[in-house]
UniProtKB/Swiss-Prot annotation:
Coiled coil: none annotated. It comes from Escherichia coli O111:H-. GO terms for molecular function: NAD binding; UDP-glucose 6-dehydrogenase activity. Transmembrane segments: none annotated. This is UDP-glucose 6-dehydrogenase. Phosphorylated on a tyrosine residue. It results in a significant increase of the dehydrogenase activity. Pathway: Nucleotide-sugar biosynthesis; UDP-alpha-D-glucuronate biosynthesis; UDP-alpha-D-glucuronate from UDP-alpha-D-glucose: step 1/1; Bacterial outer membrane biogenesis; lipopolysaccharide biosynthesis.
Length: 388
């Protein structure tokens, strides 16, 4: 069975490598350098398991820039292209997904298309009506950037947005490649599957925002935030997870998914969803004000990446802090090894860590790290538990 993956980011690659253990997989991408790396068994993204599997496992996997080669004769086409949130329209930009669908319909109209990209609630059914097609359904992904393949090898659940034989066969592909057995698998309608994805991520954002507000309260009143969080989380109904204070929720998924869900609530009474989005802005204001209260001459930003083990800093929360500090006229320098540019938003990138430490009189870091241990007195962080 030939499976095509359109898009070789975290979602596309992790699904492709998972399935390529047992089936032919062809990955399509428009970036020639990424395709070349993949065909040399090298990962274009930082992900321990993806790197390991490409280098050491027997995979029936190749990549191409040729859409005709990729889509021809494929049984399933997994669509994993980016859907950025457009603040002007209050809607995901689904143009890349729609472009793939048009190409597949033109080249291989019998292929079953599976959307893995995050999309608005109701999008799949709207597409079916608009294009007059039925060979498509949505299946959300639940993964962490930097651990994408691990999360597909050990999934918490599989959700398939269709009840049919072809949906069952697709679920079997994911189950077959996983290390974990007896995976909870849920078959729903596509619209319900779309809602599951957005509500799951919005709940995670809610939890981040909750513990951040607890931490803001503790810092404002001079209380020990760690003791409070530990005491609260010993209640098994709350649990000791996803509770580490931060500069706000960030990254590619949570900010855009919460805003999209809020937009989907346009005609539905709500309070909590809007409050989550507002709380994240308030947290960034609070953090920036706390840093500025120390009257720094130069603020050093240690790492722009969203989390450890990732090379991605799309919409990382520390960027919001950085912009607020710069808006008050305080110079900002950046230490970020994965950057090739010399500037980021008009702030200088310092490549030498020692020089960076010497030049900054306050260093802000979303998480404490051993690299900063020798200048701990300069470091401002709200991370308490050494985890993302």
């Amino acid at each position: 069975m030939k499976i095509t993956i359109s898009g070789t980011g975290y979602v596309g690659l992790s699904n492709g490598i998972l399935i390529a253990q047992h089936h032919e997989v062809v990955a399509l991408d428009i970036v020639p350098t990424k395709v070349e790396m993949l065909n040399q068994k090298k990962s274009p993204i930082v992900d321990k398991e993806i790197e390991e599997y490409l280098a050491t496992k027997q995979l029936n996997f190749r990549a191409t820039t040729d859409k005709y080669d990729a889509y021809r004769d494929g049984t399933y086409v997994i669509i994993a292209t980016p859907t950025d949130y457009d603040p002007k329209t209050n809607y995901f930009n689904t143009s890349s997904v729609e472009s793939v669908i048009r190409d597949v319909v033109d080249i291989n109209p019998n292929a079953v298309m599976v959307i893995k990209s995050t999309i608005p609630v109701g999008f799949t059914n709207l597409l079916k009506e608009r294009l007059g097609i039925d060979n498509i359904f949505f299946s959300p992904e639940f993964l962490r950037e930097g651990r994408a393949l691990y999360d597909n090898l050990h999934p918490s659940r599989i959700v398939i947005g269709e009840r049919s034989e072809r949906a069952g066969r697709f679920a079997a592909l994911l189950q077959e490649g996983a290390v974990k057995k007896d995976i909870p698998t849920l078959f729903t309608d596509s619209t319900e599957a779309e809602a599951i994805k957005l509500f799951a991520n919005t709940y995670l954002a809610l939890r981040v925002a909750y513990f951040n507000e607890l931490d803001s309260y503790a810092e404002s009143l001079g209380l020990n935030s760690r003791q409070i969080i530990e005491g609260v989380c010993l209640d098994p109904r709350i649990g000791n997870h996803y509770n580490n204070p931060s500069f706000g929720y960030g990254g590619y998924c949570l900010p855009k998914d919460t805003k999209q869900l809020l937009a989907n609530y346009a005609s539905v009474p709500n309070n909590i969803i809007g409050a989550i989005v507002d709380a994240n802005r308030t947290r960034k204001d609070f953090i920036a004000d706390s840093i500025l209260a120390r009257k720094p001459k130069v603020v050093g930003v240690y790492r722009l990446i969203m989390k450890s083990g990732s090379d991605n800093f799309r919409a990382s929360s520390i960027q919001g802090i950085m912009k607020r500090i710069k808006a008050k006229g305080v110079p900002v320098i950046i230490y970020e090894p994965v950057m090739v540019e010399d500037e980021f938003f008009h702030s200088r990138v310092v490549r030498d860590l020692t020089a960076f430490k010497n030049e900054a009189d306050i260093i802000i870091s979303n998480r404490m790290t051993s690299e900063l241990a020798d200048v701990a007195d300069k470091v401002y962080t709200r991370g308490l538990f050494g985890s993302d």
